[in-house]
Amino acid sequence: MEPDIKSISSESMEGVSDFSPSSWEHGGYLDKVEPEIDENGSMIPKYKIYTPGANERKYNNYMYLICYGFVEDVERTPETGKRKKIRTIAAYPLGVGKSASHPQDLLEELCSLKVTVRRTAGSTEKIVFGSSGPLNHLVPWKKVLTSGSIFNAVKVCRNVDQIQLDKHQALRIFFLSITKLNDSGIYMIPRTMLEFRRNNAIAFNLLVYLKIDADLSKMGIQGSLDKDGFKVASFMLHLGNFVRRAGKYYSVDYCRRKIDRMKLQFSLGSIGGLSLHIKINGVISKRLFAQMGFQKNLCFSLMDINPWLNRLTWNNSCEISRVAAVLQPSIPREFMIYDDVFIDNTGRILKG
């Protein structure tokens, strides 16, 4: 069955239209890894492989690695035999590399490294990772492992306030997530294009609902109920704009037909934690295709879109419950957007 979207009636320039569940029938579910404990009470490290997309190039050996671990104190008191104090959980993204090594070899070598964790600040709170140790199977990721890396804390750390400044902290890895990049390419639309606004344009957004195997309310997420009565969480992303010349708008029904012809296919991966992969199997307009970098395989990382929801998916199974196309007027240029807002003592809002 070909993916399609149900028709929408639109007398305005806005509309919401659901995609058929067949468009995420293959690859719309990520299973969680069941923890195992050894005789000493420590978690046994595991790995899992994800293959989102159509797997057009099954043997190219390109893969994205992200590992998860406990942030714990380095010091240990030998005379008391106390276990190291666990402070929080963090994700350590390693990025893309090409390797023919067995996943177990990658995992064991990662676990043998000494990975340090430090809390600092710039425009936002940051987490700095450093690592040391011999590299063999992990040579394709040598740059990030030997040079260190820095991330916005909210994206990679569950409770950054628990990371101590007066003690050395280390990451004890317990899970390695491997996303095989087996399609003809993986492409993330540049932020400048995602923020592109234009008058007389219709913005093409996606509203994605996720069913997560967790108590959303305990995580501070209100959520909503799907048609089966399950609580789901949602996020929205921007794909591009339908632009018409001569100062006119396309109708929403016209845009819907354009989207229908694109025959979009959705799947989940583990780029940056959780990622939505979109494959364009049909026909796409030249202008919209240009906005997507002339790529038919797109990837959106939830780490960048909604880091709070992304952290919830780290150790829980997750599946797509619903995907809808949302058509809205593009925000006009005259609408002022402030990345930084300051308020003076008179209450006036000033541009930063």
Swiss-Prot record:
Posttranslational modification: Ubiquitinated; regulates matrix nuclear export.
Region annotation Disordered: where it falls in the sequence: 1-22
Pfam families, A to Z: Matrix_Paramyxo_C (PF23765), Matrix_Paramyxo_N (PF00661)
Gene Ontology cellular component list: host cell cytoplasm; host cell nucleus; host cell plasma membrane; membrane; virion component
Sequence motif Nuclear localization signal, residues: 244-258
Positions of short motif Nuclear export signal 2: 268-276
Keyword tags: Host cell membrane, Host cytoplasm, Host membrane, Host nucleus, Host-virus interaction, Membrane, Ubl conjugation, Viral matrix protein, Virion
Positions of short motif Nuclear export signal 1: 106-115
Effect of residue 93 to A: Complete loss of budding
GO biological process, one term: virion assembly
Highest taxon above the source species: Viruses
Effect of residue 92 to A: Complete loss of budding
Location within or outside the cell: Virion; Host cytoplasm; Host cell membrane; Host nucleus
GO molecular function: structural constituent of virion
Function: Plays a crucial role in virion assembly and budding. Forms a shell at the inner face of the plasma membrane. Transits through the host nucleus before gaining the functional ability to localize and bud from the plasma membrane. Mediates together with fusion protein the incorporation of the glycoprotein to the viral particles. Also participates in the inhibition of the host interferon type I antiviral response by interacting with and thereby inhibiting host TRIM6.
Subunit description: Homomultimer. Interacts with host TRIM6; this interaction inhibits the IKBKE-dependent activation of the type I interferon signaling pathway. Interacts with host ANP32B; this interaction promotes M nuclear localization.
Protein name (database record): Matrix protein
